[in-house]
């Protein structure tokens, strides 16, 4: 008998391993997704190592050294401005690396929070059904009919102008200040921008989660769990959410590009994170007036936005293809 059990276990293990291999093989066949993953890994590595690879503090100003060309030597005669300096003499490479840290943190945090809220709302709405489902989903659909960017601009304008009057938990600002290496007063803006992005980011995720719940709750295994006395919470945690993992991963990977663009757009228009805290959006905004005299400034600050948004989309496409059970090997 023990030998029979061992043989059964040995036969089951390759199935699990082979499923992982199948998913990995599907993803690796998507050449653009693989290349994009390497691009994102490089940008994330730069963001993590920003304090190490940046020769200057991103907010330090060298008076009289504004608009230095890439490769110029700093005032101390030792350190080099690899990408030159900006309009007031701040090292551009240092600001780009720290901006990567901030912009990516905003996008990832907003996406994670949106997925969590979307899972909670979608699970409750789909599982309870009836009046609760009708009211919640009509509200979600109404909010989705509103153009998001104009509304985000209005909300951001009101929030940024009145940020002193908005209570933000000190633990959040201190954590963001520590993570992003910025002042706590500047971290308040980061927290508020994340909250603004999340306010609309969870809507699509909630609809996706509701669809999964409506499909799974009528399945035989769900009815069996209910008949055995499993609580509603246990059914949601053990059946609904696990079945939503794959579509949620795809949605999150595709949604990150949107958050990158929205954050950059808000900062570019002066309604997001404010200078001197560097983000790709506010750096591009400051550089646009000097597009012809100093073309490297908008080029350097705009390229990461383009690369990240494109790379996240390609990775999302690759993940979707890899997790699609209908796709042939």
Predicted segments, located by residue:
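A short amphipathic helical element positioned immediately N-terminal to and/or at the very start
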Residues: 19-29, 82-85, 89, 93, ...
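Small/polar loops that bind or transfer phosphate-bearing groups
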Residues: 15, 37, 84, 127, ...
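N-terminal signal-anchor/first transmembrane alpha helix
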Residues: 11-61, 136-139
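ABC-family P-loop ATPase nucleotide-binding domain
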Residues: 1-19, 328
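Alpha-helical transmembrane segments of integral membrane proteins
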Residues: 88-329
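Residues marking the start of alpha-helices
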Residues: 23, 79-81, 182, 212
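Residue-level detector of transmembrane insertion/anchoring sites
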Residues: 20-21, 76, 307-310
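Hydrophobic alpha-helical transmembrane segments of membrane transport/permease proteins
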Residues: 4-6, 46-85, 269-277
